[in-house]
A protein has these predicted regions:
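Secondary-structure transition/capping motifs at alpha-helix termini
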Residues: 1-3, 37-44, 64-65, 69, ...
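N-terminal catalytic cores of NTP/NDP-binding nucleotidyl/phosphoryl-transfer enzymes
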Residues: 2-76, 95-110, 115, 132, ...
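Structured secondary-structure scaffolds
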Residues: 2-49, 101-105, 149, 155-369, ...
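A glycine-rich helix N-cap at a beta->alpha junction
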Residues: 77-92
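Cys/His-rich short segments
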Residues: 116-169, 173
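Helix-rich, typically C-terminal accessory recognition domains appended to large enzymatic cores
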Residues: 121, 330, 342-379, 396-504, ...
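Intrinsic disorder at enzyme termini
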Residues: 475-580
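Phosphate-backbone binding interfaces of nucleic-acid-interacting proteins
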Residues: 545-681
């Protein structure tokens, strides 16, 4: 018997700055689907995930929580692992960068790179973004803020060790050009080449002295190893790499077959990581796939925006496999996917309840109703039309395996699961074409009826076997109801393997019952209210740690200083009548989306929800608010201002602001929670 081919797949390790949301969870579900699929094909899969637990941001979060960094990451890592387990991920190894073996190996790697001249000591002076753990030059900033997250950056100057990135740049460019599948999708490759590699690489800071929560540099312990040299190396340290002699597990599995990561960290995995590996004289991973984001209503999901959907809330409301189905089905290959609670309910009802759940329930129920649960192949094909219908069903069913395989080889998982559901759709159509309830009334058609139910049962068995990589619990429930087992992948292009005479369950289970939005949405509103309160409390603690005043609901960022401000006198304008005032319509609005206006350095374009409508409003507040900060804010809006174009962009209202003596602006917001659309009187 030949040895199974190996397949080593990894996810990015989750950063332990907080509980992972459904966008983070998507990655582990996607990786799990790929890992399960490869196992079904006969591969010896090693699937690794875990948590990234060092850095300044974590140190500050722990301070805010009043506990040690280790206690903090223990809590968050435990939460990550709980959620990964909850969504039924079949990982083989869960790593933590605080594990002793990882820390020991990172120290060895750092020393090796230093000894061979790839790392040198210098000093850094520039701008630092704490949330992103990234240094930037002035020219790299966007509107004076971090180009990755849009937050404020702080001046930083410190002694540091640097890695000579430029030494390996040409070699990496050549590798990428000669290995077209290395970076996928291709658009990510083009971005890395054109934006980073071809313009030239700067040497990379690989140590810090301004915080202590990290792996100390062995020979210079006031330095801690900077996040990427620590985090990225988990892919080799945790399978047994050692500069002094690596394990059999490492020799078997490296290079990785697939690094599955978010598109926002492609640069680190396709530039920094390959160069580190070249310096260590190790082969590069075969492929790095930068998957798109799952956006909440069209905007990036972020705890800082307070628009987070968590996996455990989705699982509680919809179930594990419904959650898995949604994130796998709604995420395209290259473009960002959209998630809203309404869309989840719609997809649950249309696909899981109507197409799949209804099919299985009808088939099992009819087998019990007409034949006491016995499924028997009689070979009765009926007339020529019915024979053609049977042949078409069998062609679709037996052809699905190869269609799924083609999609999965290209990592087009959403397309693969769509192919499986096309099989189930064909089965539902087959029921309409063969009308078992009509056949049941004709004694002469009993053999034909039995054959129809056999064909359905066989088709569903094949479909469930293909579904198992994506929705494992559901697939197992289906074959249990049919009193059979999941098929081997090699047999999924064959029709007729279901054992004739098998008795299906006499107690069919409804796999997915239809949901009503009016039952689900009140629960969603409770979740959102609790999350908002939790987020605001966390921000207040962090602000205190950073020495900043926390921002109250209507008080603005300088609430703590408001008592010290001098009163302002301004020139009075011409009086207006009450009738004039009544012409103005003011309402509370909620900003659901915001972006900078391309042709202006001052303007932001916001989509503002006001009651049941959404207005586009352009405001000159870009100096004071980033687009990210705007999303989720409740604001006061003049809603009946005549539309006008600002910098070529249509504006349909005005956001109300206060202005101090220096001309600084602050949005006016309700002092207490108010619904979008509430009148201002």
């Amino acid at each position: 018997m030949s040895e199974k081919p190996k397949y080593y797949i990894t996810t990015a390790i989750a950063y332990t700055s907080g509980k992972p949301h459904i966008g983070n969870t998507y990655e582990i579900v996607l990786a799990d689907a790929i890992a399960r699929y490869k196992r079904s094909q006969g591969y010896d899969v090693f699937f690794q995930t875990g948590t990234d637990e060092h850095g300044q941001k974590i140190q500050e979060k722990a301070e805010a929580a009043g506990i040690s960094p280790k206690e903090y990451v223990d809590q968050i890592s435990g939460e990550v692992k709980r959620i990964w387990d909850m969504v039924n991920s079949s990982y083989d190894n869960f790593v933590r960068t605080t594990d002793e073996d990882h820390e020991k190996c990172v120290k060895k790697i750092f020393k090796k790179l230093y000894d061979q001249g790839d790392i040198y000591k210098g000093s850094y002076e520039g701008l630092y973004c704490t949330p992103c753990e990234s240094f930037w030059t002035e020219s790299q900033l966007v509107d004076g803020k971090c180009p990755d997250c849009g937050r404020e950056v702080q001046p930083a100057k410190e002694e540091a060790y640097f890695f000579k990135m430029s030494k390996y740049a040409d070699r990496l460019i050549d590798y990428i050009n000669t290995h077209p599948d290395f970076i996928q999708p291709v658009s990510r490759k083009n971005e890395m080449m054109n934006n980073f590699l071809l313009p030239g690489l700067q040497d990379l800071c690989v140590s810090r002295t301004s915080f202590s929560w990290g792996i100390p540099v062995d020979f210079d312990p006031k330095h801690v190893v900077y996040v990427w040299l620590d985090a990225l190396t988990n892919y080799i340290t945790k399978i047994g790499y050692d500069p002094d002699g690596s394990s059999e597990l490492f020799k078997k599995n490296w290079p990785a077959d697939l690094h599955l990561i978010g598109k926002d960290i492609v640069r680190f995995h396709t530039i920094y990581w390959p160069i580190f590996l070249m310096a260590l004289d190790l082969p590069l991973p075969k492929q790095v796939f930068g998957h798109p984001w799952l956006l909440q209503g069209g905007d990036k999901m972020s705890k800082s925006k307070g628009n987070v959907i968590y996996a455990d809330d989705m699982v509680r409301l919809f179930g594990v496999d419904a959650t898995r189905y949604f994130v796998l089905h709604e995420m395209p290959f290259e473009n960002d996917g959209i998630i809203t609670w309404d869309l989840v309910i719609e997809r649950f009802n249309s696909d899981l309840a109507n197409i799949l759940g209804n099919l299985v329930n009808r088939t099992v129920s009819m087998s019990n109703k007409y034949f006491d649960g016995i499924v028997k192949s009689t070979g009765a094909t009926g007339d020529a039309d019915q024979t053609a219908i049977d042949a078409d069903l069998k062609a679709v069913v037996t052809g699905t395996r190869d269609k799924v395989a083609k999609k999965m080889e290209g990592l087009r998982v959403a397309d693969a699961i769509t192919e499986v559901f096309a099989l189930f759709r064909r089965c539902n159509k087959y029921i309409d074409e063969t009308t078992p309830w009509v056949l049941a009334k004709d004694e002469a058609q009993q053999d034909r009826l039995a054959e129809v139910l056999y064909n359905l049962t066989e088709s569903i068995t094949i479909g469930a076997s293909l579904l198992h990589s994506f929705l494992p619990e559901t697939a197992e429930k289906i074959v249990a109801q049919l009193n059979t087992t999941l098929r081997d992948f090699d047999d999924l292009d064959q029709f007729g393997l279901y054992e004739s005479g098998t008795k299906v369950t006499d107690k069919p289970e409804i796999l997915f019952g239809r949901l009503k939005a009016e039952d689900v949405m009140p629960e969603v509103e409770k979740i959102q209210a609790a999350q908002k309160a939790e987020f605001e409390a966390e921000q207040a603690k962090l602000a205190a740690v950073e020495g900043k005043a926390a921002c109250g609901c209507g008080a603005g960022e300088n609430a703590a200083d408001s008592a010290d401000l001098e009163p302002m006198d301004i020139e009075a304008k011409e009086e207006i009548t009450f009738d004039d005032f009544e012409k103005l319509q003011f309402q509370v609005g909620e900003i659901v989306k915001c972006e900078a206006v391309a042709k202006s350095k001052k303007l932001l374009c916001s989509q503002v929800k006001i009651g049941n409508q959404t207005k586009q409003i352009v405001s000159g507040i870009r100096k004071y608010y980033s687009p990210e900060e705007m999303v989720g804010k409740k604001v006061m809006v003049l809603v009946n201002l005549k539309p006008a174009k600002l910098a070529g962009v249509l504006s349909e209202g005005m956001l109300l602001c206060a202005e101090d003596a220096e001309g600084n602006l602050a949005l006016l917001t309700p002092e207490k929670p108010m619904p979008a659309g509430a009148p201002i009187e």
